[in-house]
């Protein structure tokens, strides 16, 4: 996610990130050590219009049963803590009941609940966040128990859903904010308990309209991608620390199906976070401006959003993101996002009356660039935190083929994957800001203010909940 603590850990270290290249070994065994979950979409009922476009109004989430209470939390590779809302928070107990869809946690019902500290505090760039306690309890993951598992509860919160952060332990809020020692978060705890062999997982979000995706801790599903996986290094700070899942984006281009040629936008490599917790993608301002101009998007600076006609969902142009060698090709049907009506039934329109949709790429400003769901849905990704690398392949949308392989240990490559030779190993975190070069589009095509001006920096999303593979879910058991 675009969190303050996440950005702090990067920007205070250096203006450049560096990388080393290693790899992971994936083998198929009779009894593989894999913990997996299907990702299911859900829609928050009757959300306020600003919440539809807010960062965490809904999203890719896992469903968790906390003492027979179902709680949803965002799956987030851009942060590292699991935190959930409590039933006694002022935000969740307000008259509007904003946490009703996501659920809340009542610690008084657990006999194994233990307080660790009162130091939990996390905030995000959009102004949301949570604070409260670090605690331990028993967590059941797909029938596997993790005793004395540490997570956080938000007594104070401004987000209707909690977050399941699965990034580096160094990205935990108590580390980045206070310099305290880290604790084993979910993937690290699964390794420590011997349930998976490596701190690595694969992510298949599937397309925008699909009802299901998949996350596998300790595993890869070769039936969910096309061709070969290609592996690039995660970038580290000048001090050698790995704090975030950031790689080098080396180019962006646009291709039409009719012409076939790739028109690349001139740009230097830039560090981008591969962040499943961000619904939109955020690129350097100058690069965003070039993309907007190429598709005649209309930029609204009051919302930091670009709008396009909703009919562009049928456009045959595709954006191509290159990472030294592997590419993610994204169709307009993944980038054109319909906000739907607001609480008063008004829809975003241009002044000529045509319906306006949000374009799924926004300017990053002075923050780190992020590739969120609008781009990541078109890729199959393997995040290897033990060896500090990410493997990428084109996704196979709506695939029903399953071939799950276990991620082992060591420095051998993944099945059907190769390390990218001479991959870019350093890139600036931020670029110069300013969108003065953006065209306003055709005359009279700027969105109207009624129903079309979001009040918060957006991450437009449709809700996603994760149920366990073969029916197993993430279950918190309190005894």
From Swiss-Prot:
Source species, domain of life: Eukaryota
Glycan attachment residues as annotated in the record: 68, 121, 398
UniProt entry tagged with the keyword Coiled coil: no
Keyword Membrane attached: yes
Pfam families, alphabetized: Asp
SUPFAM superfamilies given in the database record: Acid proteases
EC number(s) reported in the record: 3.4.23.-
Residue positions assigned to the propeptide: 452-479
Domain Peptidase A1: 58-393
GPI-anchor amidated glycine lipid sites: 451
Single GO MF descriptor: aspartic-type endopeptidase activity
Purpose: Probable GPI-anchored aspartic-type endopeptidase which contributes to virulence.
Family statement drawn from the similarity comment of this UniProt entry: Belongs to the peptidase A1 family.
Name recorded for this polypeptide: Probable aspartic-type endopeptidase OPSB
Organism: Arthroderma otae (strain ATCC MYA-4605 / CBS 113480) (Microsporum canis)
């Amino acid at each position: 996610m675009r969190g303050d603590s996440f950005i702090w850990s990067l920007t205070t270290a250096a203006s450049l990130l560096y990388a080393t290249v290693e790899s992971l070994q994936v083998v198929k065994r009779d009894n593989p050590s894999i913990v997996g979950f299907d990702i299911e979409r859900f829609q928050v009922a009757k959300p306020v219009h600003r919440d539809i476009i807010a960062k965490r109004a809904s999203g890719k989430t896992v469903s968790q049963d906390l003492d027979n209470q179902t709680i949803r939390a965002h799956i987030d590779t851009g942060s590292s803590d699991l935190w959930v809302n409590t039933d006694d928070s002022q935000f969740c107990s307000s008259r509007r009941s904003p946490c009703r869809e996501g659920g809340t946690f009542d610690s008084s019902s657990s006999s194994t609940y233990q307080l660790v500290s009162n130091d939990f505090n996390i905030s995000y760039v959009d102004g949301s966040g949570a604070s409260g306690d670090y605690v331990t309890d028993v967590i059941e993951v797909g029938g596997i128990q993790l005793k004395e598992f540490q997570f956080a509860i938000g007594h104070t919160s401004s987000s209707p859903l909690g977050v399941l952060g699965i990034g580096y332990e160094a990205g935990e809020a108590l580390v980045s904010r206070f310099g305290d020692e880290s604790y084993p978060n979910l993937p690290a705890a699964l390794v420590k308990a011997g349930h998976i062999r490596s701190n690595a997982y694969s992510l298949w979000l599937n397309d925008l309209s699909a009802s299901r995706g998949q996350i596998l801790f300790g595993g890869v599903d070769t039936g969910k991608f096309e061709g070969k996986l290609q592996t690039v290094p995660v970038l580290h700070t000048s001090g050698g620390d790995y704090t975030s899942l950031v790689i080098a984006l080396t180019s962006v281009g646009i291709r039409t199906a009719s012409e076939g040629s790739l028109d690349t936008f001139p740009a230097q490599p830039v560090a981008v976070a591969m962040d499943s917790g961000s619904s939109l993608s955020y690129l350097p301002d100058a690069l965003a401006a070039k993309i907007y101009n190429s598709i005649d998007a209309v930029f609204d600076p009051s919302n930091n959003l670009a709008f396009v006609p909703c009919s562009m969902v049928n456009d045959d142009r595709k954006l191509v993101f290159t990472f030294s060698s592997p590419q993610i090709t994204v169709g307009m049907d993944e980038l054109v996002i319909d906000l739907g009506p607001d609480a008063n039934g008004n829809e975003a329109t241009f002044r000529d009356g045509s319906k306006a949709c949000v374009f799924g790429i926004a300017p990053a400003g002075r923050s780190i660039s992020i590739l969120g769901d609008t781009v990541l849905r078109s890729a199959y990704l393997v995040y290897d935190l033990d060896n500090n690398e990410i493997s990428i392949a084109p996704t196979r949308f709506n695939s029903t083929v399953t071939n799950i392989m276990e991620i082992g240990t060591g420095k051998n490559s993944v099945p059907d994957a190769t390390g990218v030779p001479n991959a870019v190993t350093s890139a600036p975190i931020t670029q110069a800001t300013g969108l003065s070069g953006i065209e306003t589009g055709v005359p009279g095509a700027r969105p109207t203010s009624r129903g079309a001006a979001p009040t918060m920096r957006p991450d437009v999303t449709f809700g996603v909940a994760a149920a366990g593979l073969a029916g197993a879910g993430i279950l918190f058991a309190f005894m």
